């Protein structure tokens, strides 16, 4: 990498709207976010486990369409 052309990375504390704080490196001085892993429904258990996937009849429709048994 060339010296002097890349921005300097800084360790900053990011504050979420829920009040949680996370630290990571960025070129910005401060960062504010609305949703983080502490308050997002997917990470709180309402995501993958709480999602309802409608697959009723799709496999049967596919098999019927292509004459598969």
From Swiss-Prot:
Pfam families: Ribosomal_L31
Binding site for Zn(2+): 16, 18, 36, 39
Cofactor: Zn(2+)
Cofactor note: Binds 1 zinc ion per subunit.
Gene Ontology MF term list: metal ion binding; rRNA binding; structural constituent of ribosome
Sorted UniProt keywords: Metal-binding, Ribonucleoprotein, Ribosomal protein, RNA-binding, rRNA-binding, Zinc
GO cellular component: ribonucleoprotein complex; ribosome
Domain of life: Bacteria
Biological process annotations from GO: translation
SUPFAM superfamilies the record matches: L28p-like
Family note: Belongs to the bacterial ribosomal protein bL31 family. Type A subfamily.
Assembly notes: Part of the 50S ribosomal subunit.
Reported function: Binds the 23S rRNA.
Record's protein name: Large ribosomal subunit protein bL31
Organism of this sequence: Thermosipho melanesiensis (strain DSM 12029 / CIP 104789 / BI429)
